[in-house]
Amino acid sequence: MAESHLQSSLITASQFFEIWLHFDADGSGYLEGKELQNLIQELQQARKKAGLELSPEMKTFVDQYGQRDDGKIGIVELAHVLPTEENFLLLFRCQQLKSCEEFMKTWRKYDTDHGGFIETEELKNFLKDLLEKANKTVDDTKLAEYTDLMLKLFDSNNDGKLELTEMARLLPVQENFLLKFQGIKMCGKEFNKAFELYDQDGNGYIDENELDALLKDLCEKNKQDLDINNITTYKKNIMALSDGGKLYRTDLALILCAGDN
């Protein structure tokens, strides 16, 4: 099935989803190592079998990742390589998704109750807004299809809603700073202790200076994951989740807390 889709001159949103599932064997949400090499090999074979040349985007992709063992791509990168239907592709090209800071601001707009997730109807409105900002409109049936596919692509725990880290896969890998924090997340007890330690005035939120102190300590303790030279970027992206400069416990937990235990 993946082979026939890779031979297509135009790949529909549902076909793109099937291709992704085929190659993301471990369900991590990214293609790397053998998964990525399998994609490159099968893409070249499928196009050759169909008598088709690789597109310029495909050639660039093969040149960039074909000889690398450390390559890693997300859904966004694949959507730019394959000839995906225009409106679906636009969801990965919108201005709000070109930087992590803009993404965080967009997230805050839709996660209005600070619950830490976006449900189906909110996701539908989010996608509709992205398309409208690109001067594109789709009918309700197509919008529902896109919403359903986005849930299938990003809802890794199948709870019918998207958490921040799941939704962040709409970002290109190099822009997704949340990946840096995946390996250093704390359990709920540790996180609460850290929050109370850095909320020095005990007002229930962390301001920019308090966040700066927290990030400096995290960088010192986790030098393999975090680069202290990037603190300004980390801080700017995280503060985009704040409410008027006030970063509440539930907001910071989206970045640093792994769970309740």
Swiss-Prot record:
Residues 11-46, 53-88, 98-133, 142-177, 186-221 form the EF-hand domain. GO terms for cellular component: cytosol; dendritic spine; nucleus; terminal bouton. It comes from the Eukaryota. Ca(2+) 3 binds at residues 155, 157, 159, 161, 166. Ca(2+) 4 binds at residues 199, 201, 203, 205, 210. GO terms for biological process: regulation of long-term synaptic potentiation; regulation of presynaptic cytosolic calcium ion concentration. One of its GO terms (molecular function) is vitamin D binding. Residues 2-7 are annotated as: Interaction with RANBP9. The keyword Protein biosynthesis does not apply. Transmembrane segments: none annotated. The keyword Acetylation applies. SUPFAM superfamilies: EF-hand. InterPro entries: Calbindin_Ca-bind, Calbindin_six-EFh_dom, EF-hand-dom_pair, EF_Hand_1_Ca_BS, EF_hand_dom. This protein has four functional calcium-binding sites; potential sites II and VI have lost affinity for calcium. Interacts with RANBP9. Buffers cytosolic calcium. May stimulate a membrane Ca(2+)-ATPase and a 3',5'-cyclic nucleotide phosphodiesterase. Belongs to the calbindin family. This is Calbindin. The gene is CALB1.
